[in-house]
Amino acid sequence: MTDISSNPEGEVLLLDKPLTWTSFDVVRKVKNTLRIAKIGHAGTLDPLATGLLILCTGKKTKQIDQIQAQEKEYTGTFRLGQTTPSFDLETAVDAERPYVHLTPAEIEAAATRFVGVIEQTPPLFSAVKIAGQRAYELARKGATDTVIKSKTVEIKTFELTRIALPEVDFRVVCSKGTYIRSLARDLGTALSCGAHLTGLVRTRIGEFRLADALTLDAVQALAPPRPATDDAARRPRRERQQKPPAPRAGLEFYAAQQASAAPVTSAADAPATTN
């Protein structure tokens, strides 16, 4: 790849977004690493999703709207029988309902109801603007009566690739603006058991595929060398103090859950209990 920072035409970069990183985290990292003046992303991914994030630099930023409008493909996992306010693992379970009576045929039949052009209501924990504020800002302040307008989206494919209750793995091909977290909620409602999203990977945007994406480590390897100066050669370089990463608002519960789920060894090796 050519020196991205000096390419006047710009680049379309495919990135594999890490778990818990925001889309802006990735943009900032790439901007600083490659020293790019103009850069933006073509479609947000939630912090708890991973996969394809497209970044455009220089003149290629004019293509952002065109790329955003293309269909998306996702794979992931729903957890039946439990709901959360955010429809994913960002918040604690707020309700549990029976699910063991459901058959694969019933779950498949419910999924088919969401294929095609549908009306979908975005999650309260989303970037949708309400009276000038992001919905997630209102949600984190405890607002529960916020009304979010539904919008028209298209689910082109909703394939259930594995059913191992309470988990259901899926593949979805959908239009711009579709919330997979909302699809989890709606499927759970259709099954009268509730559901939330426990894992999500974006595998494709139009013809751009995750298989062709760079990791952030690969981006680091593309960093242009810093120009040496006489002053820099004479002066010893000061070691920068490593700052602890800033806490990401909204992921405190997820981080605590992951910490508590860390394996603990014991002499007894007692089996874990289930709810």
Protein language model annotation of sequence segments:
Residues M1-N275:
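Catalytic/RNA-binding core of pseudouridine synthases
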